[in-house]
């Protein structure tokens, strides 16, 4: 573990990993808006099929987090991340084959679904592998900083990938876009080849659900945090349009500014003062942002709510993730982090359809009341996490 004694070198190496993850995660982000457009306009299928093609990748990610964590524990973070990037590239190739001119719409859609399922597996394996590898390089005491960097790479890819994906779809067509998504992970694979591996830790393995039993409180907190982000991403523009307010497109911008600003300024805080205190304050800020969105009298108050939501959401994942790392031995770290991330994945996947049903009956503002209540419940879970930690220390 010589790398952990040279923090500047270890940090630079994890920044290089973050850059590779950003480059590779563009494969996910660029496809996100392009896939439903291709399914509906290119294949002539219904909107429901377009939504399924997007959502199936996230379902695959949720279902494979445990397996990805077990790979990271058994094989080491570097090999796990490398496998994830290869799977990314293979998924891009399969989605490229879905654009083959000789295929019927049904056959093309079937091939596309297979590629999207594989993409979800790749996302799961690559992210868990990188977190495990990064913590191995920087040390247990800086696990929160590692997870903050991972989030910056992923959300940065989302911010750039959406418009870039639509631009490439317009200029290159769906096949050309999928070729790019297959090439980017290979570039990331080359970029991380020179970085040193960290040997996996020896120790007795435990069943996945037993590990979940150890970490469910921080997992629930991060999942409840994700409700507000998912609600904002899905319904902010519709909320503004229903009220006749201007600047409907600035909601995610304000969220992103708050999110990135807090990651840059406070990414070190979970390691310095503890994950639970950071999560408690963060979830309180997110709840305030969601309640402000719910009660907003005008567009600028709502935009301020989006900014507060971004500030609040930013550090919950690394803060609660650092608590997870404390609660399991090193040889189970990857499995625990995989299960932990699945809580957030589940929140992202379930919030859209559930909140949509509620919005149909109660209006779009009601969605943000639900987000505020979820963040408040998450705040309570973070408080109980701190109490459990204090009892264990006593």
Give short role names for the model-derived ranges:
Residues 13-53, 58, 221, 229-239, ...:
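Helix-loop boundary and gating motifs at the non-cytosolic
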Residues 22, 107-125, 301-315:
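Hydrophobic core of transmembrane alpha-helices in multi-pass small-molecule transporters
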Residues 58-66, 158-159, 256-264, 348-349:
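Residue-level signature of mid-helix packing/kink "hotspots" within the transmembrane helices
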Residues 64-77, 262-274, 359-360:
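Helix-to-loop junctions at the C-terminal end of transmembrane segments
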Residues 86-105, 285-297:
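C-terminal ends and interior cores of transmembrane alpha-helices
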Residues 115-153:
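Cytoplasmic helix-loop-helix junction between adjacent transmembrane helices
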Residues 182-201, 381-386:
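C-terminal membrane-cytosol helix-exit motif in multi-pass small-molecule transporters
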